[in-house]
């Protein structure tokens, strides 16, 4: 079912009329441009779904996917609105189970992820990896399948009702270390170039950049995405996590080869022979 307006409680009610479980996975992208878009995705949509779930007599469980690091004082618009969305949802549906993943990685659609950024840098910048100066936060990458398993286990366990879980991978990396792993697996010598944040913003606003190059780099040069790499997206050890859901998450190191297969496919997309070899 495709809704016209996810912020409409009426449409959400129609969508869940035959459901006893509601799972909200809707969220803003890190390259969303307007404050309204963040508020719609992270606050208004969850509120509409929570109200619809509360009003539906047959809905027994509500799972809300938020984000680790959600904080009202964060410099990130995404994380600020994620926190506000959590508070609104808990007020409407107190029995909601909130899952807060860190940096999610997947090998289905790598383009809007760090693997996608790495691929673009290989194709356009001749294998050079650039980081914004002073923005090398720590992160605990988590595989998207582990988040899906967390949802399933949460639904099976009644003790998860009304609880919040921080879900992160077993190891902590800096963003530079993640890119270095990509380099090492692809057999390319690591080379990182630091760019001042002011220079990146100036480049983003160049007139010649507004057409073709804006479309090409729009994801990676949005200020929200650039500053994301300054954030520490790690779990709070005081909060409940994967262990409480009886899950041992897969480490980034074990999955990096799968990500690189997708990187190779994108990087060699002009060559059908290389496409086939990358997928073997």
How would you describe each model-predicted region?
Residues 73-188, 207, 215:
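Oxidoreductase cofactor-interface core, primarily capturing Rossmann-like NAD(P)-dependent enzymes
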Residues 39-43, 63, 82, 140:
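Short alpha-helix in the Rossmann-fold core of NAD(P)-dependent oxidoreductases
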Residues 9, 13-19, 47-50, 144-152, ...:
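Short, amphipathic alpha-helical "lid/cap" segments that border enzyme active or binding sites
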Residues 1-54, 68-72:
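NAD(P)H-binding glycine-rich loop region in Rossmannoid oxidoreductase-like domains
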Residues 7, 41, 139-142, 170-173, ...:
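Residue-level signal for the nucleotide or nucleotide-sugar donor/cofactor binding architecture
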Residues 54-61, 93-94:
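A short helix->loop->beta-strand "cap" motif at the edges of active sites that frequently abuts
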Residues 198-280:
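A hydrophobic C-terminal alpha-helical subdomain
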Residues 25-26, 62-68, 99-101:
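SDR active-site strand-loop-helix element
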